[in-house]
A protein has these predicted regions:
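Internal glycine-rich alpha/beta core junctions
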Residues: 1-258
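C-terminal amphipathic alpha-helical interaction region
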Residues: 216, 232-377
Length: 377
């Protein structure tokens, strides 16, 4: 039987056309039977158990789109001839080179690569913790669950947010062609945008992270377990990774401690407007901290392997080794991407944290009052 369920319209969307989105009507003719799943009044609790899994899946979908955009951009940059090599920019007869040899394009691709690889590491780490939470027992299982709880809103929101940025950068690498449907990066961009909206908007992920997973979590156990893992990575990197990167991550953790203490104080004092204004900026900064953790961990593993494979070769000798040894080239790419992100992108984290601190001094009425001078559309 139909059970008085009807599709009343199909939505016309920006992207994701392979997935039909429609409006459904249940019981308009008062002939629809609903069935209770689980205990009465416990629906939200049950739903959140399901959402944890689907939110991670959304983050993985976003990572897939970002990874594809990066691969398309690298492939295009390798084959698109435009301009001369920067070392011959004043030579009129200099030959054209692939745009991947232009420093600005290399920087764009490196930024995309660094984001994609750190997101992949973090997503795999979360997936491993899910398995460990089921395989281990006692406190070890609970610690794995704590890490999963705190990472899921970060991965869902961070990966989906960056997917929009990464696909846009891939379009930029393609130039005008990227804006046309001749190349797939345009579709990747419009398809990925919905991922920051579905399964709880990224603003909701921020609220979930800061309130439920940290401030309202007993003794901040989730955060403390995660922090201990990061501190272990910093310790393991000693003597392998430059101290400047280790110290940056350590300082980043200390700033996070301080901001969370301040937010807890706001909550205890009932200053929820000030608190909630800053949960999304904090979630964005927190994700940067997680990516920095992954990159430091990556350097700790990749640097010794690269040194062993290249035997300290530099300049042309290093170029020759990388050309004939795919494994050496793999680790070289890992080291370059991680160092690039830690040196050029992670410093922005500290500006974001300062902005959160200074932003607490900005006071304005919530809701419509501040926009009263804006006419309605």
């Amino acid at each position: 039987e139909r059970n008085d369920v009807f599709c009343t319209g199909v939505e016309h969307k920006m992207g994701a056309h392979g997935s039909a989105t429609c409006a459904m009507s249940f019981g308009d003719n008062e002939n629809c039977t609903g069935y209770l799943l689980g205990e009465r009044g416990r629906g939200m609790n049950i739903m959140f158990q399901m959402l944890n899994e689907t939110r991670l899946e959304v983050g993985i979908m976003a990572l897939g789109g970002s990874s594809a955009a990066l691969q398309y951009a690298v492939d295009y940059a390798r084959t698109r001839l435009q301009g001369v090599h920067f070392s011959k920019m004043f030579e009129a007869a200099a030959p054209k080179v692939p745009i991947i040899e232009h420093p600005d394009v290399t920087r764009m691709l490196m930024g995309m690569k660094a984001l994609v690889e750190a997101e992949r590491m973090l997503s795999y780490y979360a997936a491993m913790q899910i398995d460990l939470s089921k395989l281990l027992e006692g406190e070890a299982s609970r610690e794995a669950r704590s890490i999963v709880d705190i990472l899921i809103p970060l991965i869902k929101a961070g990966n989906s947010e960056n997917a929009w940025q990464i696909t846009a950068e891939a379009i930029q690498v393609h130039g005008g062609y990227g804006y046309c449907s001749d190349y797939p990066v345009e579709q990747l961009a419009v398809d990925c945008k919905v991922l920051s909206i579905v399964e709880g908007t990224n603003g909701i992920q921020s609220l979930d992270l800061v309130m439920r997973k940290i401030l309202l979590n007993a003794d901040r156990k989730n955060y403390k377990v995660l922090k201990s893992r990061i501190e272990q990575t910093i310790e393991n990197a000693s003597g392998i990774v430059d101290d400047v990167y280790r110290n940056m991550l350590l300082e980043g953790l200390q700033q996070m401690d301080s901001i969370l203490d301040t937010m807890k104080k706001h909550m205890d004092e009932g200053r929820y407007h000030t608190l909630l204004l800053n949960v999304d900026p904090l979630r964005r900064a927190f994700f940067d901290l997680m990516l920095a953790w992954m990159h430091l961990w990556c350097l700790t593993l990749a640097r010794p392997k690269l040194s062993a494979l290249t035997a300290g070769a530099k300049g042309e000798a290093l170029t020759e080794v990388l050309a004939r040894d795919a494994e050496a080239a793999f680790y070289y790419g890992k080291v370059c991407a991680s160092e690039f992100w830690l040196a050029t992108e992670f410093p922005k984290y500290f500006g974001k944290m300062e902005g959160i601190s200074l932003g607490e001094t900005v006071d304005f009425l919530p809701g419509n009052a501040v926009f009263s001078s804006h006419p309605c559309a």
